[in-house]
Each structure stands twice: as C-alpha cells, then as structure tokens.
Amino acid sequence: VGIDLSPTAVAAATEAAAERGLSNATFVCADITSFTGYDGRFGTIFDSTLFHSLPVEGREGYLRSIRRAAAPGARYYVLVFATGAFPPEAEAKPHEVSEQELRDAVAPYFTINDVRPAYIHANSPEGMPAPPDAPRDDQGRLLMPAFLLSAHAEN
C-alpha cells in the first residue's frame, strides 16, 4: 500500500503499477501523519526520503501512525538526507537529519537495529548547483550523503 496526500500522485502511481502488471499494488490518498485503517497490517515499512520532507512537528504523528500500522516484529527502514547533503547556500532544501536526530525521533516507536551511512542517488535539483567534485553513479546521478536506519517493532 502506498500512501500520498496528493490525488495526482496516487493516480500516477496507480497507473504506473497497472502498466507494470502489479495488480496487488494499491495506493490511497491520506495524510501520512494521521492515517488509520491499517492497524497491525504491515510486516515491512520502507520510508524512502519522506521523513526529512515532513515538517519537524509532523514527525510524531507520522511515527505514531506507521507504528500502529506495523505488525508485531515488523521491520522499518528509513532513508534520509544526512546533515550536510546540500550546499549551505541552497535556499530550498529538505530538512537534513543528523544520525542522533533520527535515532531520537524513531526510538520511542521502534527498536533501532542499525543506522549506517548511505547515499541517495539523485538528479541534480533544478537551480541547485552540484559541487564539481560531487560523487556520481554510473548514470550520472549525484550520490548525496544519507543515513539508512533499520529498526523493528516489538511484539
């Protein structure tokens, strides 16, 4: 189940899944900080670059909602931009997260197994110059500093 606040994004994801023959993929329009109806349903929850996009004051509701949706023993993975991922002069950027900030936010809801350095492979955002020495993958995407947290829900 994919959850997004935007009906346009939900429609696009639904169409893309249908084009790929993914008949068991579903997408719903809901606020990720307060969704209900999935209590104990998911054995794996993966947050790929959402956490750092939320307003800091929305994190508690988000984590409470996904913890409620987690089955006993569920695995939870979070990929976030690390502090320093964007140039200091960048005007528009997501909230970069320190390892400790990530741990402090998640620990009341899940048992943290590991937080490790990672990269987010990204196209250079419009209007955001990439440092000339920035590492890139074989497709030319920027390798932006990140953290990957893995955790689990206690029974």
Predicted regions mapped to residue ranges:
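Short catalytic micro-motifs in class I SAM-dependent methyltransferases
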Residues: 49-53
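Conserved acidic residues
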Residues: 43
